[in-house]
A protein has these predicted regions:
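A contiguous strand-loop segment
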Residues: 2-106
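Alpha/propeptide regions of enzymes that mature by internal proteolysis
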Residues: 1-3, 93, 104-132
Length: 132
């Protein structure tokens, strides 16, 4: 069986229920989690840097999720903020490509820190899209 360009990858799905709720789920396509991974809560005001070694930011919104609490930069694999925005990092080996330069008016964010940055700074999907 030929697998094509993608030999492994996580999946996610979301749906609206008849009673008006929004549900989201995902799988994790690795046989183990990084040592130190845990369910965590990050309160408003938690410091982080969207680029390793870069200038610091603070969370506007509290976040909870599963992740790795690196000393200066927490990483969330999936999470939810106190405004109801939720998301997850999905991994597709060799699928993503990143530009060499920075777009005018945009801030650099390294991929492992993107979910935390969006959940920590955005209250809605529309805000997250503008942030990208």
């Amino acid at each position: 069986m030929e697998r094509g360009f993608c030999t492994a990858g996580c999946s996610a799905l979301s749906w609206h229920t008849k009673d008006g709720k929004h549900l989201w789920g995902r799988n994790y396509d690795f046989d183990r989690l990084a040592e130190g991974t845990q369910v965590t809560f990050l309160p408003r005001g938690t410091a982080y840097a969207p680029v390793a070694g870069g200038s610091g930011e603070t969370l506007r919104y509290a976040c909870a999720g599963t992740g790795l609490l690196l000393p200066q930069n927490p990483v969330l694999y999936e999470g939810l903020n106190d405004q109801g925005l939720m998301g997850g990092q999905l991994y597709y080996r060799s699928f993503a490509a990143y530009p060499d330069g920075l777009d005018t008016g945009k801030r650099p964010v390294q991929p492992p820190f993107l979910l935390l940055h969006l959940l920590g700074q955005c209250a809605t999907v529309e805000e997250a899209v503008r942030c990208l």
